[in-house]
Amino acid sequence: MIAASLRRMITHPAAGGVLLFAAALAAIVMANTDARALYNAIIYFPAQSASATPSHLSLLVLVNDGLMAVFFLAVGLEVKYELLQGALNSRVRAAFPAIAALGGMVAPAVIYSLMTAGTPALRAGWAIPAATDIAFAVGVLALLGTRVPVSLKVFMLALAIIDDLGAIVIIALFYNTALEPLALAAAGAVIGIMALMNRANVRFLSLYLLLGAVLWGCILLSGIHATLAGVVVGGLIPLTLPSTEVSPARALEHWLQPWVVYLILPLFAFANAGISLQGVAPGHLISFLPLGIAAGLVVGKPLGIVLFTAVAVKLRLARLPAGIAFRHIAAAAMLCGIGFTMSIFIANLAFGHDDPETIVLAKVGILSGSVIAALLGYLLLRAILPQPQGSGSVPVGG
């Protein structure tokens, strides 16, 4: 009886989303109570504290650079299928999430820049609201279970991948991160080998994964966020092979699904959501920095996505994914305002660890904006999506 109930609970379409947010809530509570020392001991294990060098192996590093690369591998596999055989299988449909991602980066940056124009010291933070935390956005979608159409979730995943790539480019160009040319060259060579394997219809999945691990190491050493390796490997694993119905990409995607939903995403949430609000005062909520970030996330993200895609559709540069309308896009675009971990990462680069007060203000804006965007996006989608009628959602994240 208990086993049957547990099985039903685990296999519920919304179980992954519930688990992710439960892990995030546990992290926030621990980080702001007497359990803070225990929380830090867990996420920085085996290091002693957050003061360890970024290269020091810890649970946080393992999750963010290692396990999240696996998550992006699963997302990359899914988006590749949709680009070749699914909801994005034409040029105008594939262009839709790309244009949406562009609008979702430009508009928040503009709004932030306008709201902080009077404070030159804050100009460096323009990219903070341009980022989307794909893990938490997918987590909110998972809470809606099978009500989410396949095409809408695929749109979100494709947009988030492009957004993440955009964030990597922004960080490399504007935030003076040191890149290692030799490691980049090695990564390029590995990508070239995998591309040749794909073209030659090499079917050994283990060989792709082995080279993928090498690519991950090269990208990690290059100074670029290592999760990029997951996207690249997902795009290079063959979807179909001649003279066979076997799909290596689909087989790997289905195998990864439960690991992503029930282990990787909850661990990511727990390791990254523990934001300490110590020292935050009510007055912090109405200063220009948090207001600019929150406005960029809550207003800029959906506004940019909707405006850019509406113009693109009008000019016939893009087409809406099948089965959804602009009201679905507008509601899903609100979820892209969940900046959270990527926004915090950019804030640390923009203002440096030697300016703790500014970092606290930035985190207030990121956390408040992300929570508002998540709640509004969830409520809007819940209002416009039909009640579940069986299956219909895609696997990653829910």
Swiss-Prot record:
Stretches that traverse the bilayer: 9-29, 57-77, 95-115, 124-144, 154-174, 177-197, 204-224, 226-246, 255-275, 288-308, 329-349, 359-379
Coiled-coil residue windows: none
Catalytic activity, as annotated: Na(+)(in) + 2 H(+)(out) = Na(+)(out) + 2 H(+)(in)
Alphabetized UniProt keyword annotations: Antiport, Cell inner membrane, Cell membrane, Ion transport, Membrane, Sodium, Sodium transport, Transmembrane, Transmembrane helix, Transport
Protein name listed in UniProt: Na(+)/H(+) antiporter NhaA
MF (Gene Ontology): sodium:proton antiporter activity
Gene responsible for this protein: nhaA
Originating organism: Sodalis glossinidius (strain morsitans)
Membrane-topology descriptor: Multi-pass membrane protein
Family membership noted in the UniProt record: Belongs to the NhaA Na(+)/H(+) (TC 2.A.33) antiporter family.
Keyword Transmembrane included in the entry's annotation: yes
Source taxon at top rank: Bacteria
Cited function: Na(+)/H(+) antiporter that extrudes sodium in exchange for external protons.
GO cellular component: plasma membrane
Keyword Ion transport attached: yes
Residues annotated as signal peptide: none
Location relative to the cell: Cell inner membrane
One Gene Ontology biological process: regulation of pH
